[in-house]
Each structure stands twice: as structure tokens, then as C-alpha cells.
Amino acid sequence: MNLLKVNDMKILITGTSQGIGKAIAEKFLQNSHEVIGIDRQSSKIDHNNYTHYRLDVRDYANLPEIKNVNILINNAGTQNEDDIDINLKAVIHFTEKYGIQDNIHSVLNIGSASAHTGSEFPEYCASKGGLLAYTKNVAMRVAKFGATCNSLDPGGVMTPLNECVMSDERLWEQIMGETPLKKWATPEEIANWAYFLTVENTFCTGQSIVVDGGESINRKFIWKD
């Protein structure tokens, strides 16, 4: 079966209650895929092809038995004292349980541009940095199935969790001063990248794709007038 010519793949996504995860789920649903979401919050998605499990991604003992997952997207994340457990350990557990099997077409880890710059809280940077190494590990292991594994690493995204940043005029001005494109991504833009990397892409694997409006470049281009 050529998975690129069908739109009935089974997609498992963590962290689908809002923001990036919700946008990714909706993107796949728009393209007629079966989507399964896992989040500790209830879902606002109402669609016949969507199934929601309300549980913590660290609750390994109660994870559902989901067979024949074609695409796994590890999106659930946090920025607190649980960084390592949720952002890294849970990703490893989910991938080993659902992603390393012969029906897999693609694994995508939602990382962070801060993994490349170190410009975040220590535990958060460490968790996302570890994700980069694990992405390469998985890419080597799923290649035998003809599958890919990549990390999609956004910079600023206009999500409800970032409302406190976007509403702080002074902080926002400072951030825009460091961002060449002078804007943040929408969740839908990140969802488009996720769809491309997991469905349309068949050759790029083991890579980290930074989508941050150029912020990580930290460019200082000096040239004569």
C-alpha cells in the first residue's frame, strides 16, 4: 500500500486540547484521516473521525492499546518542573510503544528552537535538546520500515499559553527586535509543516526543522550602503 495515495491513515497525537496539537489534529481531519488524541484536558474537537483519551501522558499504566498507528506526533509539552518527564521521557515511552512497529509511516517530535540556542529555562532546554538526539535514534530504527522521524522545532507561536507574552507590550517589542520576520507563527502554520513532514515527505529523516521567523539566526549583517 502506498500511504501517500490514501487518506485513511491512523494518526496519534499527544496534547490536542489546544494550540499546536489541536491545529495539527484539525489539519489531518480536514484531509480525512483517523485521528486519536491524548491530553489531560478535554477536547474541543467534534468530528466523527476523532477519538479523544483524557489522561496524562506520564500515566503509562493506563495508556490505551492502539494498534497499527501510521503517524505518531509527540506534541504534548510543558514548561515547569515536569519538563524532563513530559517533554522527553513521555516522548520516549510513547514512541517505543506506538512508533516502533512495521505499520509506522512517520514519527514527528514537536521540539523547540530553544534546543538550538539554549535561550530558555535550563530544564526546558535540556528536555528539548535531548529530543534532538532521540529523534536521530528513532530515525535510524524506523528506516527499516520505510518510515521517517524528524523534529519540528518552532520558535514563538501564537497559542493561548503564550497570551501572557503577546500581551506584554515591552516584552513583545523586545522579542520582535530579535525576530527578522517581525512576527510569530500561527498554530495552523506549524500544522502545515507537521502535515508535510509526516505525509508528503518520504526522504528527509533524522533532521530538526527550525521554524522561528529567523530568531535563532541572531543575524548581524553589515554591508556598505
Annotate the PLM regions:
Residues 75-79, 214:
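Conserved NAD(P)H cofactor-binding loop of Rossmann-fold oxidoreductase domains
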Residues 106-130, 135-144, 156-157:
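Catalytic loop of short-chain dehydrogenase/reductase
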Residues 183-211, 216:
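C-terminal substrate-recognition "lid" of short-chain dehydrogenase/reductases
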Residues 143, 148, 205-207:
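Short, small/polar-rich loop/turn modules that mediate ligand/substrate recognition or access, typified
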Residues 153-164:
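Short, flexible catalytic-loop segment of classical short-chain dehydrogenase/reductase
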